[in-house]
Design a protein with these regions (language model features):
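AAA+ P-loop NTPase catalytic core and its hallmark functional loops
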Residues: 1-174
C-alpha cells in the first residue's frame, strides 16, 4: 500500500499524525483536504523560529473602550471546536512554541490547559480535535518528548496524486 492510501485510512481515525518527507510532495495539501469529518473546521499555521506560543495559545488585544480582551489563538480555537489543526514545518518551532505544543499534543482523553486569561478558563479538546503536523526532515529532528506525542508518523515519499490533479494540465507529468 502506498503512503497516500495508508494516510487516507489512518487520518480519519487518528487524533495526532506527523507527516514527513521531501518538500513539494503534497503533505499540507492532503492535510487540508482529506479525511475531514463532516463540517470539520481547519486551522493552519506554518512555524518558524520567530513564531510565538501566543499565535497558538492566544493573547490580549485592545478593544474599542481601551480595555483588553482575550483572543484565543488557533490552537485553542481548534481545541474548543473539535477542529483539525494543521501545523506546517513543526521542526522549525522555537522553544516558546515547543513548550505549548506539548500541551496541545497530549492525549485528548487527558489533555487540559488553563488559559492565562482573566477567567483562568480551563479548556479541553472537544470531540474530533485533531493535529496533523508536517515537516521536511525526519522525526528524529524533533525533541523526543514531542515526537513521542504522535502515535502515527508517516513518511510521504511520493507526490500526492490528488495534488497533481489540481495542477494545470500543462504541468501534470512534468
Amino acid at each position: 500500500m502506498d503512503c497516500w492510501n495508508l494516510l487516507s485510512k489512518v487520518l480519519p481515525v487518528t487524533p495526532r499524525v506527523l507527516l514527513y518527507g521531501p518538500p513539494g510532495t503534497g503533505k499540507t495539501y492532503f492535510a487540508n483536504t482529506e479525511g475531514l469529518k463532516e463540517n470539520q473546521q481547519i486551522y493552519q499555521t506554518t512555524l518558524t523560529q520567530d513564531s510565538t506560543a501566543a499565535e497558538l495559545l492566544g493573547h490580549y488585544v485592545p478593544n474599542e473602550s481601551g480595555a483588553f480582551d482575550w483572543l484565543d489563538g488557533i490552537g485553542i480555537k481548534a481545541w474548543k471546536e473539535g477542529a483539525r489543526l494543521v501545523i506546517n514545518e513543526i521542526d522549525n518551532a522555537g522553544v516558546d512554541v515547543m513548550t505549548f505544543l506539548h500541551a496541545l499534543l497530549d492525549d485528548p482523553k487527558f489533555a487540559k490547559f488553563t488559559l492565562p486569561n482573566k477567567e483562568k478558563e480551563t479548556v479541553r479538546p472537544a470531540t474530533g480535535f485533531q493535529i496533523v503536523a508536517t515537516m521536511n526532515g525526519v522525526p528524529d529532528d524533533l525533541p523526543e518528548a514531542l515526537a513521542d506525542r504522535f502515535p502515527v508518523k508517516l513518511h510521504m515519499d511520493t507526490v500526492n496524486p490528488s495534488a497533481i490533479q489540481e495542477l494545470p494540465a500543462n504541468l501534470q507529468g512534468v
